Regions:
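Short, charged/polar "capping" segments at the starts of alpha-helices
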Residues: 36, 82, 109-118, 172
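Hydrophobic beta-strand segments of well-ordered beta-sheets in folded domains
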Residues: 24-26, 70-73, 97-103, 134-136, ...
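Gly/Ser-rich helix-loop-strand patches that form or flank binding pockets
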Residues: 12-65, 154-185
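Charged docking surfaces used in two-component/phosphorelay signaling
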Residues: 2-13, 141-147
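Short acidic/Ser/Thr-enriched loop-to-helix initiation segments
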Residues: 52, 63-103, 117, 121-129
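Glycine/small-residue-rich hydrophobic helix-like segments
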Residues: 114-168
Length: 185
């Protein structure tokens, strides 16, 4: 176990935490019954704070419950790296027999749509290497943050796991040098 105490903006701390701990995955909890939208453990606030993180997060409800791995939702978009997240989806499918669903929305911009199509093709090909055939769910909502849509969809359709795309690019330095994930992978 590793522990660290940081002071400052929650979004910046969460973004740096994985690297400071040299973590592969960080487990955190959220309070789905929280009525106040500005609380740090509210799912919508938590997802917004994690969007810059380069470390995978496993988010659990604060209530004890048996986790159901039968259905896994993998969000994909146009701009984020998807290799690590797709590997996590394949892990659940291979070792828990999970059904994997690719969750995405289309873009009006043809370049963004092309990038999304490439990410979808990559995810399908990688999962296919493990004999996993994912189902697809295309959202019609282009305005709401995709991860928040996935949270609502997963709750409605009884998904046990959501794998969100947390790498959000890009500082000027990242654009020149490249994202750390690209170099590692």
């Amino acid at each position: 176990h590793s522990y660290i105490s940081l002071k400052g903006n929650s979004k910046e701390i969460i973004g740096k935490l994985g690297q400071l701990l040299n973590a592969v995955i960080i487990v955190t909890s959220c309070n789905t019954n929280e009525k106040q939208k500005n609380k740090a453990d509210n799912p919508s606030v938590l997802l917004k704070n994690m969007e810059n993180s380069r470390t995978a997060y496993l988010i659990c409800n604060q209530k004890e419950s048996i986790v159901d791995y039968k259905k896994v939702l993998l969000t994909l978009n146009n701009a984020r790296e998807s290799k690590e997240k797709t590997l996590w989806a394949s892990y659940f499918a291979r070792f828990f027999g999970s059904e994997v669903t690719l969750f995405y929305h289309t873009y009006k911009d043809s370049f963004y749509q092309k990038q999304l199509n490439l990410n979808l093709a990559f995810a399908r090909k990688m999962l296919g290497q493990f004999s996993i055939i994912p189902s697809n769910h295309k959202s019609e909502d282009r305005k709401t943050l995709l991860d928040l849509q996935a949270l609502n969809y997963a709750d409605k359709e009884n998904y046990g796991v959501i794998i969100c795309q947390t790498t959000k690019d890009k500082s000027f330095f990242d654009k020149i040098k490249g994202l750390e994930e690209v170099k590692v992978l």
